């Protein structure tokens, strides 16, 4: 999966951004749990990509005046 671009994020509605944010946070939680339980992650760089996407979404929501 590729990174979500700011242009794409700004075109989303607030509900879409919040849904995507919850989706990514859940995926990050699952990956972190897998790593901590001793499992091997298929793509370790995916964790950093998800973290950056979450930050982009939160920044876009803050720009709209929505507190996350």
From Swiss-Prot:
InterPro entries: Ribosomal_uL29, Ribosomal_uL29_CS, Ribosomal_uL29_sf
Single Gene Ontology MF annotation: structural constituent of ribosome
Presence of keyword Transmembrane helix: no
Superkingdom of the source species: Archaea
Keywords noted in UniProt: Ribonucleoprotein, Ribosomal protein
Presence of the UniProt keyword Membrane in the record: no
Pfam families in the cross-refs: Ribosomal_L29
Cellular compartments per GO CC: ribonucleoprotein complex; ribosome
Alphabetical GO biological process terms: translation
Gene3D superfamilies found in the cross-reference section: 1.10.287.310
Paired cysteines (S-S): none
PROSITE patterns reported in the protein's UniProt record: RIBOSOMAL_L29 (PS00579)
UniProt similarity note: Belongs to the universal ribosomal protein uL29 family.
Protein name: Large ribosomal subunit protein uL29
Taxonomic source organism: Archaeoglobus fulgidus (strain ATCC 49558 / DSM 4304 / JCM 9628 / NBRC 100126 / VC-16)
């Amino acid at each position: 999966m590729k990174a979500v671009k700011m242009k794409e994020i700004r075109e989303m509605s607030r509900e879409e951004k919040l849904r995507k944010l919850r989706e990514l946070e859940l995926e990050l939680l699952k990956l972190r749990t897998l790593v901590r339980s001793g499992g091997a992650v298929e793509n370790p760089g995916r964790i950093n990509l998800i973290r950056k996407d979450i930050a982009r979404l939160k920044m876009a929501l803050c720009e709209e005046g929505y507190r996350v």
